[in-house]
Protein backbone atom coordinates (compact mmCIF):
# COMPACT_ATOMS: atom_id res chain seq x y z
CA UNK A 1 0.00 0.00 0.00
CA UNK A 2 1.50 3.34 -1.09
CA UNK A 3 -0.19 5.91 1.12
CA UNK A 4 1.13 9.46 1.29
CA UNK A 5 2.43 10.09 4.80
CA UNK A 6 0.32 12.77 6.36
CA UNK A 7 2.25 15.43 8.20
CA UNK A 8 1.03 17.23 11.29
CA UNK A 9 0.84 21.03 11.30
CA UNK A 10 3.31 21.14 14.16
CA UNK A 11 5.90 18.86 12.54
CA UNK A 12 7.82 21.87 11.29
CA UNK A 13 6.39 24.81 13.22
CA UNK A 14 3.18 25.35 11.22
CA UNK A 15 4.92 25.65 7.84
CA UNK A 16 7.11 28.73 8.41
CA UNK A 17 8.03 28.73 4.70
CA UNK A 18 4.47 29.82 3.92
CA UNK A 19 4.98 33.19 5.55
CA UNK A 20 8.58 33.87 4.54
CA UNK A 21 8.44 37.37 3.04
CA UNK A 22 4.83 37.96 4.11
CA UNK A 23 3.45 41.08 5.77
CA UNK A 24 1.51 40.65 9.00
CA UNK A 25 -1.50 42.35 10.55
CA UNK A 26 -2.57 42.97 14.13
CA UNK A 27 -1.51 41.64 17.50
CA UNK A 28 -1.88 38.07 16.26
CA UNK A 29 0.32 38.75 13.23
CA UNK A 30 -2.07 37.24 10.72
CA UNK A 31 -0.49 37.06 7.23
CA UNK A 32 -1.78 39.76 4.87
CA UNK A 33 -3.48 39.13 1.54
CA UNK A 34 -2.64 42.24 -0.48
CA UNK A 35 -5.36 44.06 -2.38
CA UNK A 36 -5.53 43.38 -6.10
CA UNK A 37 -4.63 46.23 -8.45
CA UNK A 38 -8.05 45.94 -10.09
CA UNK A 39 -11.44 44.68 -9.03
CA UNK A 40 -13.00 42.16 -11.38
CA UNK A 41 -15.69 39.54 -10.98
CA UNK A 42 -14.92 35.89 -11.82
CA UNK A 43 -17.04 34.20 -14.50
CA UNK A 44 -17.91 31.52 -11.97
CA UNK A 45 -16.70 29.54 -8.99
CA UNK A 46 -15.28 26.06 -9.43
CA UNK A 47 -14.87 23.84 -6.36
CA UNK A 48 -11.33 22.58 -5.79
CA UNK A 49 -12.36 18.96 -6.43
CA UNK A 50 -13.83 19.87 -9.84
CA UNK A 51 -11.06 22.12 -11.12
CA UNK A 52 -9.88 19.55 -13.72
CA UNK A 53 -13.31 19.76 -15.38
CA UNK A 54 -13.42 23.58 -15.44
CA UNK A 55 -14.27 24.85 -18.93
CA UNK A 56 -12.27 28.03 -18.68
CA UNK A 57 -9.66 29.58 -16.51
CA UNK A 58 -11.67 32.77 -15.86
CA UNK A 59 -13.38 30.95 -12.99
CA UNK A 60 -12.24 31.25 -9.40
CA UNK A 61 -11.15 28.09 -7.66
CA UNK A 62 -12.91 27.92 -4.30
CA UNK A 63 -12.79 25.67 -1.28
CA UNK A 64 -16.43 25.69 -0.18
CA UNK A 65 -16.22 21.96 0.51
CA UNK A 66 -15.59 19.80 3.55
CA UNK A 67 -12.04 20.30 4.80
CA UNK A 68 -10.88 16.70 4.08
CA UNK A 69 -11.51 17.29 0.35
CA UNK A 70 -8.70 19.84 0.22
CA UNK A 71 -6.52 18.45 3.04
CA UNK A 72 -3.69 17.72 0.58
CA UNK A 73 -3.47 21.44 -0.19
CA UNK A 74 -3.14 22.19 3.52
CA UNK A 75 -0.43 19.53 3.86
CA UNK A 76 1.62 20.49 0.77
CA UNK A 77 0.61 23.89 -0.67
CA UNK A 78 3.69 24.04 -2.93
CA UNK A 79 2.48 21.02 -4.90
CA UNK A 80 -0.48 23.03 -6.23
CA UNK A 81 1.14 26.32 -7.31
CA UNK A 82 1.34 25.51 -11.03
CA UNK A 83 -2.15 24.02 -11.05
CA UNK A 84 -3.66 27.10 -9.42
CA UNK A 85 -1.78 29.54 -11.65
CA UNK A 86 -3.85 28.25 -14.60
CA UNK A 87 -6.88 30.00 -13.16
CA UNK A 88 -7.49 33.72 -13.14
CA UNK A 89 -8.56 33.72 -9.49
CA UNK A 90 -8.06 31.67 -6.36
CA UNK A 91 -10.11 32.10 -3.22
CA UNK A 92 -8.42 31.50 0.15
CA UNK A 93 -8.91 28.12 1.81
CA UNK A 94 -12.25 27.82 3.54
CA UNK A 95 -10.90 26.18 6.70
CA UNK A 96 -13.86 25.57 8.98
CA UNK A 97 -14.48 28.16 11.68
CA UNK A 98 -16.98 26.27 13.78
CA UNK A 99 -18.82 28.66 16.07
CA UNK A 100 -18.68 26.13 18.90
CA UNK A 101 -14.92 25.57 18.52
CA UNK A 102 -12.53 27.12 21.03
CA UNK A 103 -11.26 30.54 20.00
CA UNK A 104 -7.72 29.16 19.54
CA UNK A 105 -8.99 26.70 16.90
CA UNK A 106 -10.89 29.42 15.07
CA UNK A 107 -7.79 31.63 15.07
CA UNK A 108 -5.46 28.90 13.77
CA UNK A 109 -7.88 28.04 10.95
CA UNK A 110 -8.08 31.70 9.98
CA UNK A 111 -4.28 31.97 10.20
CA UNK A 112 -3.78 28.89 7.97
CA UNK A 113 -6.20 30.27 5.39
CA UNK A 114 -4.43 33.64 5.25
CA UNK A 115 -0.93 32.09 5.36
CA UNK A 116 -1.62 29.81 2.40
CA UNK A 117 -3.41 32.55 0.41
CA UNK A 118 -0.53 34.95 1.07
CA UNK A 119 1.93 32.24 -0.02
CA UNK A 120 0.05 31.62 -3.26
CA UNK A 121 -0.20 35.36 -3.90
CA UNK A 122 3.57 35.76 -3.52
CA UNK A 123 3.97 32.85 -5.95
CA UNK A 124 1.95 34.39 -8.77
CA UNK A 125 -1.66 33.43 -8.02
CA UNK A 126 -4.35 36.12 -8.13
CA UNK A 127 -6.08 35.83 -4.76
CA UNK A 128 -9.70 36.92 -4.53
CA UNK A 129 -9.83 37.86 -0.82
CA UNK A 130 -12.69 37.06 1.50
CA UNK A 131 -13.33 37.57 5.18
CA UNK A 132 -14.73 34.71 7.25
CA UNK A 133 -15.76 34.55 10.85
CA UNK A 134 -16.80 32.03 13.44
CA UNK A 135 -18.48 33.08 16.67
CA UNK A 136 -18.78 36.62 17.99
CA UNK A 137 -15.25 36.46 19.44
CA UNK A 138 -13.95 36.64 15.86
CA UNK A 139 -15.98 39.51 14.43
CA UNK A 140 -16.43 41.93 17.34
CA UNK A 141 -14.13 43.73 19.76
CA UNK A 142 -16.23 42.73 22.75
CA UNK A 143 -13.74 40.03 23.81
CA UNK A 144 -10.52 40.80 21.94
CA UNK A 145 -9.11 44.24 21.03
CA UNK A 146 -9.22 43.47 17.29
CA UNK A 147 -11.82 41.96 14.98
CA UNK A 148 -9.89 38.77 14.25
CA UNK A 149 -11.92 37.78 11.19
CA UNK A 150 -10.79 40.87 9.29
CA UNK A 151 -7.07 40.70 10.09
CA UNK A 152 -4.92 40.12 7.03
CA UNK A 153 -7.57 41.21 4.53
CA UNK A 154 -6.96 44.63 3.03
CA UNK A 155 -10.01 46.80 3.62
CA UNK A 156 -10.97 49.55 1.20
Question: Which residues does each PLM region occupy?
Answer:
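Intrinsically disordered, low-structural-confidence terminal and linker regions
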Residues: 1-11
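Non-catalytic, usually N-terminal nucleic-acid engagement modules in DNA/RNA processing proteins
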Residues: 10-82, 101
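Eukaryote-skewed repeat-based solenoidal scaffolds used as protein-protein interaction platforms
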Residues: 49-52, 71-156
Amino acid sequence: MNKKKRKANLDDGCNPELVRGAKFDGLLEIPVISASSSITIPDGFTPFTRREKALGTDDAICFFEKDPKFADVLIDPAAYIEDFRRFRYLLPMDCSLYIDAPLAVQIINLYRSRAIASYYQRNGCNIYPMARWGNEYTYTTAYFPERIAFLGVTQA
